[in-house]
């Protein structure tokens, strides 16, 4: 499998004749108006993660089923679930897809297909700080590059669809969290 395999559809691409289920355009407009009226407003996402053993953990988010996280066999996990970095990329893909859907709705474009393909080059030379290359600085760890490709179809030209994708990327909260340094604190209970 080449490094580009994950960025391309693996099945034959067929044009869908129906449109994706739309979001509430009126609700989106009200949410946008609220943001214009109070640009400093913030929400708080909360997650509670519990280790089961080895590297397998369960993250509880609201009333949803827990998100299971594990590491692959070559990193001493059991490979029963996506790795933490894959979960991060999943969040990025979900946020970009939400943004594309919102911007398309705002612009009056109906989407018939939307898929986001991501891959990221991640480094962990310090072995989580457990005796690896401890001389490496944090900027040399974690994602060093992320590549995203968006497959989008709808009732607009390629140019308009590309503008929608670029606009959604520019304003994506998760993409901006990854691109921009954010205050981060950690403490024990």
Predicted regions: what they are:
Residues 1-90, 100-189:
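Extended beta-strand/beta-hairpin segments
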